[in-house]
Amino acid sequence: MKTIVFVGPTLRAREVPFEVRPPAGVGDVLRASRERVQRIAIIDGYFERMAAVWHKEILVALEKGIAVWGAASMGALRAAELAPFGMIGVGAIYQALSRGVLTSDDEVAVAHLPGEVGYRAISDALVNLRWGLAAAARKGVITARTRDALIELARLPFYRERSWARLLADGRAAGVPSRQLAALAAWPKPDQKAADAR
């Protein structure tokens, strides 16, 4: 059973035990649907440098009887939009999008390097910052008030400029308590996008 996975900055290709393709752009799912494939999984996709994968091409794949899954990033966005038509969403990010808890495409967007160097992310997704702050508050690393203030600060920069380092600097400038920022800086940050993709 052939499975094609569109993945880039969320997971390294060697972590995926199926046929790997670059992040999905317009036309990629349509081309894949013309192959002898039974399953297509969309994790990563393009937002800006090229047109995003179209809803219609996913619908064409579904009409051909190909199971189409989505998780973590562009896949979660498209799965939340196309679940009524049979696309299968996976993971906490998909659930948050499908329930309307998250509503913006830029929640999952990251800047990344080209494929020749493995699509390594060079910014942090807002959803990962949000999940990390929520987890830190649950563990008592920061207070709920600090969590809320930092989430608001995390939303302000353009997605290419979002990072934990930027968020901590913005928090210092905004007067967030320094002890909490120091504790947060030392705390291991979860990667919800990668967790959903796995």
Language-model features, listed with the residues they occupy:
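Gly/Ser/Thr-rich loops at beta-strand to alpha-helix junctions
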Residues: 11, 47-49, 74-76
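General beta-strand structural signal in soluble alpha/beta enzymes
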Residues: 21-22, 41-42, 68-72
